[in-house]
């Protein structure tokens, strides 16, 4: 596993010359990977004016499932007017796993349904071609029918709205979930989109995977999808999250829809009553990370202390997140960071920024598992932690990855972060 080296604030991970622990003295590390269940989609990106949202029947910033024939008709019109700017491998979980594998140079596995018949230059061919070779696709379930598609309408303000053509994306049966693979992962990554339709095969498959992960002690990570989806299924989602989910990720609108709190800190705090760790993104206002830590493991920040809706909310942001169940005296910890370098100069669209941030968090969680297996006697593992780094450092890392996604105007990274940041003076690297 690649451990990112020096960055804007020295280390995301310690990489050399710490001299604390000899890996050779401990047990040999097992393979570390993450598993995700995704709706395999091809994103069809089109730059349009707001009138197209009404024509497609999609609310601004939301995602709606539409009739396949209607999507075919709209797609033909977009092509005829030369509004389609690209067609890419997509899907929230697919993007997250791809970016995780690129960042960590490590394996991940994608579970889902894909069309049985794949030919050169069709949608399924391009999906596979644009997915990192480190993402294992050998557990995909082949099904008769077309590939799922997401028409991504990007308006002048950079907002993206999706019209979804299902194809076979929901046809993953519970019997296709590989129990041993899920139970051996460092995390199980899911999205609330999988839970939209309780009659769909993928719903039962997702619940089955959750049960396997819960029984094996594998953290279940859920991204919330869209605010409209959360509003529609709020009560059932809250019950499922409280029962089976460990880590929650979403933007402010989505977390607010789940918790009823519109302030980001209060929304994150309310979400922590359901889960152990919360990643909350807020567009141009950066991102927040909230978690639990035992009072004995709380570490005070050495940065300025800030107060917002929660007084001195970042006082213990140098703490590493722990499962609440592992805390004798649990307390909440929060950190916030503004966009890296003020954000990308030009934001063509925000597609994938949240998936990138979540990939960074997953990298840190997997690194914790990797280190614990490699050096179980290290003092870093005297308590049961969810993360390798502090919530403060993870905020910085997630923020940097989001910036890279926005800067490249694509939801999937083509390479990891640079070994040296161009913004830093040369003597920094010699320090």
Question: Each PLM stretch: what is its role?
Answer:
Residues 1-63, 84-88, 105, 113-344, ...:
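Ribokinase/PfkB-type carbohydrate-kinase core domain
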Residues 353, 357, 394, 398:
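The catalytic Tyr-X3-Lys active-site helix of short-chain dehydrogenase/reductase
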